[in-house]
């Protein structure tokens, strides 16, 4: 009913002088036509945008984990990062997710019913359109069952208000998801006619993930079967062996805003630069950024982003998760350098004191001339590093060390919930203005890199460790610094490496 309401709303926005006799009448029969089916599919995809249209999926999936923790600002820190008493069933994020996803499921159910009943659609159109709606319904149910467990399972369209929904067993929900996706994987096209539409490989990837999730249960009764790992591997390999996708050669390319829709994206939720059609937009560019505009030589701009400081990488992520010497993904995932963009706040060399004690005096032998600019517009203004100085962050020794640099220097001890290396994954410099929150960057939900990992885990659980290692090494080869590639200078300055262009793959492969 939500699709019809939306179309009726747009139709009712015409000027009041229109004759009622000429007013358009919209009925559900419209969805039995090809134009109506296309409109229904487009509307249904809109529900997939919800997760990044605000502080939503990032809060549900990252806060309170061992990978990211709370930043300096935000209202979800107590409830989702600390699991304090503020986390209640009536929380706004949970309510919004429930409402959005069940609206999408309702639309999909109605559309599927109308597609089945249509006498006007070509059989080929009916089969493909029905499969596409099944993909969307399964996608939404998979989100819900992972978040809430037992949930109402609605598979038929409802044209009347209902309040008698009962929660179904988790196993039943998984059975519907798998049934929907198996049909979608069989009947969707190999290549989408429009960017952002699902393909049989989108369905196969999601199906592999669903089987792996179901089969990984230890105590939960998800309906898991002994064949779940076989099914995971089967569908993951359909994607891998299709030839339809390829890993990006350089990990950095994944985050290049000019490289959207690249060969590695198996399914990505789309947005647009047209405000009228962008809904809430993709707002993830706001939440992973460090404060920078208070530093000398800097002002807030589009390229560096609008820093809401919601999420900061944990100590585990920064210090323990990566083999930083050999794995290029670490240094390619964060922003380490900012370049001066504000001539009015360029700093000069000067004597500095704290609490009455002079801790720094410019040294002319180092080119530090009292009153002269420390750097120019376009030069490095901020530099974050992983250097461990051994100095306390609030000591005169640390203040002296930092003052000796031309730029604002942040060694490891100076990283905080306000100042930290920003995650570059969601940056969106395509926004029309600095203050614009609604970004247009695509939200990649499925990547070939993940497909390889799904296959590797399934193979490992089946005891085929050679195959698991083979798939893992495909990912690790891309993760390594490539032969001929210039490494980040921190590799030899602070990580104990050397300044060379040799591949580090041998150190990473299993």
Give names to the regions the model predicted:
Residues 91, 340-478:
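C-terminal substrate/ligand-recognition segments
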Residues 32-52, 73-148, 162-175, 180-195, ...:
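Conserved, well-structured interaction surfaces
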Residues 15-76, 209-392:
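An aromatic- and glycine-enriched ligand-binding surface/loop that stacks and positions planar moieties
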Residues 10-13:
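C-terminal motif of bacterial Sec signal peptides marking the signal peptidase cleavage site
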Residues 143-146, 150-152, 192, 213-222, ...:
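Short coil/turn linking the two alpha-helices of tandem helical-hairpin repeats
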């Amino acid at each position: 009913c939500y699709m019809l309401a939306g179309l009726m709303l747009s139709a009712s926005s015409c000027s009041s002088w229109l004759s009622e006799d000429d007013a358009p009448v919209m009925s559900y029969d419209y969805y039995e036509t090809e134009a109506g089916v296309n409109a229904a599919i487009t509307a249904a995809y809109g529900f997939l945008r919800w997760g990044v249209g605000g502080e939503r999926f990032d809060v549900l999936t990252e806060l309170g984990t061992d990978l990211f923790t709370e930043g300096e600002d935000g209202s979800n820190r107590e409830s989702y990062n600390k699991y304090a008493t503020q986390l209640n069933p009536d929380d706004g994020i949970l309510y919004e997710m429930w409402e959005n996803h069940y609206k999408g499921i309702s639309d999909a159910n109605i559309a599927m019913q109308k597609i089945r009943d249509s006498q006007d659609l070509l059989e080929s159109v009916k089969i493909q359109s029905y499969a596409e709606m099944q993909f969307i319904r399964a996608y939404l149910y998979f989100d819900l069952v992972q978040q809430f467990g037992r949930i109402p399972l609605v598979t038929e369209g409802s044209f009347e208000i209902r309040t008698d929904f009962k929660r179904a067993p988790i196993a039943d929900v998984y059975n519907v998801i798998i049934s929907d996706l198996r049909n979608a994987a069989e009947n969707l096209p190999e290549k989408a006619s429009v960017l952002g539409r699902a393909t049989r490989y989108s369905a196969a990837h999601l199906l592999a993930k669903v089987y792996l999730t179901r089969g990984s249960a230890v105590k939960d009764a998800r309906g898991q079967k002994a064949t779940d790992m076989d099914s995971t591997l089967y569908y993951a390999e359909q994607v891998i062996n299709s030839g339809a996708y390829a890993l990006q050669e350089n990990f950095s390319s994944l985050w290049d805003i000019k490289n959207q829709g690249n060969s590695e994206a198996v399914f990505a939720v789309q947005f647009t630069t047209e405000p009228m059609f962008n809904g809430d937009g993709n707002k993830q560019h706001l939440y992973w950024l460090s404060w920078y505009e208070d530093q000398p030589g800097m002002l807030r701009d589009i390229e560096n982003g609008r820093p809401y400081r919601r999420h900061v990488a944990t100590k585990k992520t920064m210090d323990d998760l990566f083999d930083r010497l050999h794995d290029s993904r670490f240094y390619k995932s964060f922003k380490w350098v900012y370049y001066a963009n504000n001539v009015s706040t360029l700093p000069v060399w000067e004597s500095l004191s704290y609490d009455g004690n002079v801790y720094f005096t410019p040294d002319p032998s180092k080119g530090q001339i009292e009153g002269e600019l420390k750097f120019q517009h376009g030069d490095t203004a901020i530099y974050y590093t992983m250097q461990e100085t051994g100095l306390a962050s609030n000591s005169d020794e640390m203040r002296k060390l930092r003052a000796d640099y031309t730029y604002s220097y942040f060694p490891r001890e100076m990283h905080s919930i306000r100042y930290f290396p920003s995650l570059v994954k969601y940056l969106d410099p395509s926004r029309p203005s600095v203050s614009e929150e609604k970004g247009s960057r695509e939200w990649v939900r499925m990547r070939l890199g993940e497909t390889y990992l799904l296959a590797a885990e399934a193979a490992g659980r089946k005891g085929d460790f050679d195959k698991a290692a083979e798939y893992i090494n495909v990912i690790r080869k891309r993760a390594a610094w490539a032969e001929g590639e210039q490494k980040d200078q921190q590799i030899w300055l602070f990580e104990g490496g050397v300044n060379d262009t040799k591949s580090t793959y041998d150190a990473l492969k299993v």
